[in-house]
Regions:
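Conserved donor-binding/catalytic core segment of Leloir-type glycosyltransferases
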Residues: 5, 217-233, 239-243, 256
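Short His-centered aromatic/hydrophobic patch
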Residues: 116-121
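Carbohydrate-associated surface elements
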Residues: 175, 195
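Nucleotide-activated donor-binding/catalytic signature segment of Leloir-type glycosyltransferases, i.e.
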Residues: 268-285
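Short alpha-helical donor nucleotide-sugar binding micro-motif in glycosyltransferases
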Residues: 284-285, 292-297
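Aromatic "clamp/platform" in nucleotide-sugar-dependent glycosyltransferases that forms part
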Residues: 305
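Short hydrophobic beta-strand element within catalytic cores of glycosyltransferases
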Residues: 313, 322-325
């Protein structure tokens, strides 16, 4: 039987967004694959000195975890301050991380195909191909194309090499694919959309009422942001958007902010200065509670500076909420051109006005059938069949 290895390096301690996207890709592919699949997770571990300097929390070094009964080994790399300086300050190649990846190559000599996610795993897959002539594909999710390559000359060069060496590059949106072609040319590219878990669906009116009562928002409209409090998410605009909505809308409205990150304190301070504004900071929430949250809200807003294809907009639409956002990345591909706005001087007021329209009269905003894990798995499975059939090992 043919053997396929899947490599990814999303954070095991932050199981949302891209982590959940990869896990679902694996889960649905395993359900239909007629070939053997092994999955490997690469993780950074920051020693005490690195955590102190970077202000990051300690994480537990687990040996493995499970995806639907499939054991996934976790390979830990001890974060190096020297590597960080070389990569992000000097723009040159790492020493220890490069060695860590090179030492993994030999483990894959018996595989027929490598499916990698993002740059580091794509680099490892490229080295495996150079050593054993094993084909590989890379899936790109967002910041690995639109942000990270611009943070270091070496990362830019590495990303370009991986793009060109891959037998196929999958992008989660047409926008991300276009942005990748701005990095370089001469590589094979396809769009492979994220899907949505079956847990995200519209609840019955009675169940929605019960959940809203539990959350204390019965009889109110709810406008929500969900995501990381990072610069790329443009979260510092949220207080201004919320104030504008509150001034325009004549009924009761409350604002939810779900997530965490280094910009949270700044956003909290701005929200606290807004007299009369009703709001709630939820912090990070497990994925299991997000269907309840999205079934309790009326409108999700996402003012991002850039995106690949944000799962939260797909999930919110699947639960029956309306979504408004910036004209950034793959957001328009999901929510429609009439519900996105340029990040110009008029963005805050235009976004607030559209939110109020939706609060006053909910808009039909159906989720397109292409955002489906079954369809994604079918495309990926057919690719695996094609590439393993036409490729001959040396």
């Amino acid at each position: 039987m043919k053997k396929v290895a899947i490599l990814f390096n999303e954070s095991l301690n932050d199981r949302k967004g891209a982590f959940n996207a990869v896990v679902n890709r694996v889960r649905y592919l395993m359900q239909i694959a007629d070939f053997e699949i092994d999955v490997f997770l690469l993780q950074n571990y920051e020693p005490l000195l690195a955590r102190t300097l970077r202000g990051t929390p300690k994480v537990e070094k687990v040996k493995d975890f499970s995806i639907d009964g499939k054991t996934v080994p976790v390979w830990w790399y001890d974060f190096s301050i020297l590597d960080f300086i070389l990569l992000f300050k000097l723009g040159t190649s790492t020493v220890f991380y490069k060695r860590f990846l090179q030492n993994k190559v030999e483990r894959f000599r018996d595989y027929d195909l490598i499916l990698a996610h993002s740059t580091s795993c794509g680099y490892l897959a490229m080295k495996i191909k150079e050593r054993f002539a094993i084909p590989f594909a890379v899936s790109w999710h967002g910041s690995d194309i639109h942000t990270v390559p611009y943070q270091s000359r070496h990362i830019m060069k590495c990303t370009q090499r991986v793009l060109k060496a891959a037998d196929c590059n999958f992008f989660v949106s047409k926008s991300l694919k276009r942005q990748a072609h701005n990095l370089c040319s001469g590589f094979v590219s396809e769009v492979l959309y994220n899907g949505v878990s079956s847990a995200f669906h519209p609840y019955s009116p009675a169940e929605k009422m019960r959940i809203r009562e539990c959350f204390g928002v019965e009889g109110e409209k709810v406008v929500c942001f969900a995501g990381n409090f990072f610069d790329v998410k443009n979260v510092t605009l949220l207080p201004s958007i919320f104030r504008s909505v509150a001034s325009r809308y004549k009924g009761d409205v409350t604002f939810w902010l779900v997530g965490d990150g280094y910009r949270r304190k700044e956003v909290e301070a701005d929200m606290q200065s807004s007299v009369g504004l009703k709001y709630r900071f939820w912090g990070n929430q497990p994925s299991t509670i997000m269907p309840d949250i999205f079934n309790s809200i009326d409108v999700l807003v996402l003012p991002s500076k850039n995106e690949g294809l944000p799962l939260v907009v797909v999930e919110a639409l699947a639960c029956g909420a309306n979504v408004v956002g910036s004209k950034a990345g793959g957001i328009p591909e999901v929510i429609g051109a009439e519900n996105v706005f340029d990040l110009s001087d008029t963005f805050v007021e235009s976004t607030a006005a559209r939110i109020v329209e939706m609060l006053e009269a909910p808009v039909e905003q159906p989720l397109a059938e292409k955002f489906c894990w079954e369809k994604t798995a079918d495309v990926e499975c057919r690719f695996c069949h094609e590439i393993m059939k036409i490729t001959r090992r040396c």
